[in-house]
Each structure stands twice: as structure tokens, then as C-alpha cells.
A protein has these predicted regions:
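Residue-level marker for buried hydrophobic side chains located in beta-strands
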Residues: 110, 135, 181-183, 206
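Conserved Class I S-adenosyl-L-methionine
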Residues: 224-236
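A short alpha/beta connector and helix-capping loop motif
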Residues: 179-180, 191-224
């Protein structure tokens, strides 16, 4: 049997000399006082970030800025992410447990994205369902700017509106039948959902990421409680990633393959809530 071993040939990750020097200097300071737990932890995080940045550069060299797989395949993506990881989005494995729900976007008339970041989902929704109306929100002005830029780069800025803060009353006004609401706001989902009048959002569907916060703990129970009266609720757990499906990752070692698809998540599931009234 002929063997092609070229796909396993190791390619050096792009090296960032200046950043490598910074990491080395920091590590040197830490080793002089290894009893400092905070310093040791900071050094470990810096090392992980440094290696992840190298993997991001490798992924850019392989694929440029085009999303390779998933429901948003073909999307022109920016060269950095806001509040999330870069490489998983380019590879198309980002939050892949949501893909079955995102592939149903053409069935909706409106997509509301609360906590849109740089616009991966807001812009992706317009590409996956060209006729859909998209309303995005983010309290970070830099994220809103990146979202506008990403929409323009993909030619979908005409059907996408971007706002700053989404209050319960704002969301109720948008929650018409045929609307999918996606919420990822780092724990503030409890306040937003808790302020809704259930009858005014009973005709739309929800995708909500839960979070572990120092004040509330895991918000899963609160999210389910807020939606279960009017919606059929499904807890969407994280799924393992399969790097073997991406030939370009084969030359990398296990750690780098892992980092290419690593999203930096804790045990924080999503919740999908399907309108009971619309289903009936």
C-alpha cells in the first residue's frame, strides 16, 4: 500500500520573537519566587496564551480568514475575535453543539443576537438565511465596531442593525412569532430573562448560554426556570471535537491540535427553549 507521509510532516508554528522574550522574562521572575501561587498561575496562563497565539497564526496561514465548515462556511471572518477564541471559528468547530439549531435559521424571520461580540453569529445568520432580519446588541463599543466591519466585509450590512443595550422591554418588542433570540451576556442572562413578561415572549424561541458567576454560581437553573413555563426546554451540553476531520491539523502535536479547537470554556451548557404555543 502506498504511504503518503507528507501530511504528517511537522510544520513549525510561526514564531513571535518579541512575545517569546516577554514570556521568558516573566517565567524567570516567577522561578525566583515559586511560592507565589498567583504569579505561578499567571505564568501558566501566559504560556497557554502564547502557544494558542502561535496556533492561531498557523491556522491563518492555512486558511486565511475564511470559515471552513459548519453553518457559516464561506464567511469572511476578521483576524481577531472579541471575547472568544479565533481558530475554532475559522475551523468551523466553534460551539458545534449549536449547529443543529443554527441550521434552522432559514425557518425564522428574525434573529436577535444579545451579546453579539464581533458579529460571528449576527453576520453568520444573514449569510445562512439571506432573508432574515438581524438585530444585534453589545455593550462593548469595540465589539459593535467589529460587528459592523464584519457585516460590511460580507456584504450583509444592509439587513443588520446593531444596538448597545437590550432591556427586557426592548426584547419583548422584538419577540414576534418567527424570532430566534440568542443570548450570551456573561451571567446577565438571569436579569434579562427574569425581567421579561412570559406572555410577551411566548411566541419566539431562545438559545441562551449559561455561565458560572461568583455571585450566582451556574445560571442554568435560573435560565430554565425563567423559560420553562412557556417553552419546551432542552439543555445543550458541550460535545467533543474531532481534529482528525481537519487534515491541516495532522502535522501538529496533540497540544496544538487541542488548542486549535479549544474554546476556553468551563462546564457551562446552552439552553434551547422552543415556543410551546408556536409548536402547537
Amino acid at each position: 500500500m502506498p504511504i503518503d507521509d507528507r501530511r504528517y510532516t511537522h510544520r513549525r508554528l510561526p514564531m513571535k520573537i518579541d512575545e517569546a522574550l516577554k514570556v521568558g522574562q516573566f517565567m524567570h521572575r516567577v522561578t525566583r519566587d515559586p511560592s507565589d501561587p498567583q504569579g505561578t498561575w499567571s505564568a501558566a496562563l501566559m504560556g497557554i496564551k502564547f502557544r494558542r497565539d502561535l496556533v492561531d497564526d498557523y491556522v491563518r496561514e492555512c486558511f486565511g480568514s475564511t470559515v471552513q465548515a459548519g453553518p457559516f462556511r464561506g464567511m469572511r471572518y476578521g483576524f481577531r475575535a472579541a471575547g472568544s477564541m479565533y481558530s475554532p471559528k475559522i475551523l468551523g468547530s466553534y460551539e458545534q453543539e449549536l449547529h443543529p439549531y443554527l441550521r434552522s435559521l432559514p425557518a425564522y424571520r428574525r434573529f436577535v443576537n444579545v451579546g453579539c461580540g464581533e458579529g460571528y453569529y449576527a453576520v453568520g445568520a444573514r449569510l445562512a438565511a439571506p432573508g432574515i432580519e438581524v438585530q444585534a446588541f453589545d455593550i462593548d463599543p469595540e465589539a459593535r465596531r467589529l460587528c459592523r466591519d464584519l457585516a460590511a466585509a460580507n456584504g450583509v450590512d444592509d439587513g443588520l442593525r446593531i444596538g448597545e443595550r437590550c432591556s427586557p422591554r426592548t426584547l419583548e418588542a422584538l419577540a414576534e412569532p418567527g424570532t430566534l433570540v440568542m443570548i450570551d451576556i456573561e451571567g446577565a442572562e438571569v436579569e434579562l430573562l427574569g425581567g421579561l413578561e412570559a406572555g410577551r415572549v411566548a411566541d419566539c424561541d431562545f438559545l441562551v448560554e449559561t455561565h458560572n458567576t461568583p455571585e450566582l454560581g451556574l445560571t442554568l437553573r435560573a435560565v430554565v426556570g425563567a423559560l420553562s413555563g412557556s417553552h419546551a426546554v432542552t439543555v445543550v451540553d458541550q460535545q467533543p471535537r474531532d481534529w482528525s476531520a481537519i487534515p491541516e491539523l495532522l502535522p501538529l502535536g496533540h497540544l496544538d491540535r487541542f488548542l486549535a479547537q479549544w474554546e476556553g470554556r468551563g462546564p457551562e451548557p446552552w439552553v434551547f427553549a422552543k415556543s410551546r404555543r408556536r409548536a402547537g
